[in-house]
């Protein structure tokens, strides 16, 4: 059996590859392949596949990491049991065994222990080498030290059984191999928040039954204008005759996280095809905040208030 790739570029991924690159990686690959050729600018990038995740969680963990990992008294027995585990996966299994999503205090303690384990476990050299190699290629396509978005892409993110969109972390304006490695590990750790673990259990899944891929893509400077989310069907009714757009100022992360109330537009597809006015409904959002590149700290983003007069304007015209 051939060794699975640890990274896949967008031009090699499509919607048939969700098991390896996750929902976000597959969608971006599909967009890059089908839209770039007709003039739509899709930022290029690659996805660290679920094979990288599996390599990480199945690697041996050094005993020394436990010097930096404590645990509250209510789960001290779990920590002591996990110390005897040889791999990250087996230690995480101990941490999450028989977790009760209704016992929030205990679940919070378990989740904190699981994330500490992930953050303290060394990233295998094979993954570091792949990140270095593929990021160098991305720098050649754009410019040295190119700024990227590091975005979680779960294999269960948009499944029919449950939607995991927004459950896991993404990081913006990241630059340099070492920072990408660390942000990749933080994306993996975000699988083990109290919210994500509880959501898995409530939908009849074990947190380790799914894997996570992580997208590394060129940042689009939408903080200088606007961005948002578009659905090619109505997300509430499932009606496939319309496009639903949510738009706000700055980087799109605040829209994705539900932090801001965006402008919304419902666009009639047939109207577009017939060159008729296609907007059948629109609602002006409050758009109170926007996320931009940090003015002083490199490789950081910040949220600022949107001027009142801009809130009363449409972000898309």
Where are these regions (language model features)?
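NTP-handling and nucleic-acid-processing catalytic cores
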Residues: 170-272, 276
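Conserved catalytic alpha/beta cores of large enzymes that bind or transform nucleotide phosphates
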Residues: 242-317
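N-terminal beta-alpha lobe that positions the nucleotide/phosphoryl donor
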Residues: 1-215, 224, 297, 301-317
């Amino acid at each position: 059996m051939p060794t699975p790739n640890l990274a896949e570029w967008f031009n090699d991924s499509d919607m048939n590859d969700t098991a390896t690159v996750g929902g976000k990686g597959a969608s971006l690959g599909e967009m890059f392949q089908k839209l770039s050729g007709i003039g739509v600018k899709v930022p290029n990038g690659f996805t660290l596949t679920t094979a990288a995740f599996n390599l990480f969680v199945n690697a041996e963990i050094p005993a020394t990491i436990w010097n930096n990992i404590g645990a509250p008294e209510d789960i001290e027995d779990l920590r002591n049991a996990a110390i005897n585990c040889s791999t990250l996966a087996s230690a995480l299994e101990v941490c999450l065994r028989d977790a009760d999503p209704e016992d929030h205090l205990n679940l919070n303690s378990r989740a904190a222990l699981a994330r500490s384990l992930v953050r303290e476990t060394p990233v295998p050299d094979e993954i570091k080498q792949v990140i270095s190699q593929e990021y160098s290629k991305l720098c050649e396509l754009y410019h040295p030290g190119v700024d990227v978005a590091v975005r979680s892409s779960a294999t269960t993110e948009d499944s029919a059984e449950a939607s995991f969109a927004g459950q896991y972390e993404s990081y913006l304006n990241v630059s340099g191999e070492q920072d990408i490695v660390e942000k990749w590990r933080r994306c993996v750790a975000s699988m083990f928040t109290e919210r994500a673990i509880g959501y898995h259990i409530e939908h009849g899944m074990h947190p380790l039954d799914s894997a996570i891929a992580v997208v590394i893509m060129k940042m689009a400077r939408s903080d200088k204008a606007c961005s948002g989310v578009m659905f090619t069907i109505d997300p509430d009714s499932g009606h496939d005759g319309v496009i639903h757009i949510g738009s706000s100022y700055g980087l799109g992360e605040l829209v994705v996280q539900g932090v801001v109330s965006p402008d919304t537009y419902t666009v009639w597809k047939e109207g577009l095809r017939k060159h008729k006015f296609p907007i059948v409904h629109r609602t002006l959002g409050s758009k109170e905040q926007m996320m931009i590149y940090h003015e002083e700290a490199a490789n950081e983003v910040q949220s600022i208030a949107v001027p009142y007069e801009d809130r009363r304007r449409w972000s898309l015209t």
